[in-house]
Amino acid sequence: MKPSQIISAVNACLDARIPVMLWGAAGVGKSDSIFQIGAKRKVEVRDVRLSNLDPTDIKGFPSPDAKRGVMTWLPADFLPTTGKGILFFDELNLADKMTQASAYQLFLTRQVGNYKLPAGWDIVAAGNTEKDRANITRMAGPLANRMIHLDFEADVPEWVAHAQANGIS
């Protein structure tokens, strides 16, 4: 899909509260498109790189609750707690299998452990394809099945129009 088609399709997925995954070569504008969408919607885009995290970072940090005799999980500070926005898992498939697996529940039910994604937040991910030789980890079915997948293709005329409109030379 061309960038303009991607933006339209991602907006439709966000409106329907369906997580979406953008696939495309490095540098074609996947991330920029998500930040453009966030700006148009006037919402925060929170960029999370699973490749920089451990599996426990998604679920949270274990904390004993001695009073109740249970272990609770303190959510990571990169996970939103209020407001509206797009939780953007950029370069999702650069993360190892265990770290990707830690996000399964978040993509399906919008929660993981004790953490629940606020109602005003949506999930978008992006990554490179195997043919891009980007050292990716193939996404397991349980994660892949929780998203709509869109192929992002570079389009020279659209890029030139974007560059001219934004003073890029």
Language-model features: locations:
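AAA+ P-loop NTPase catalytic core and its hallmark functional loops
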Residues: 1-169
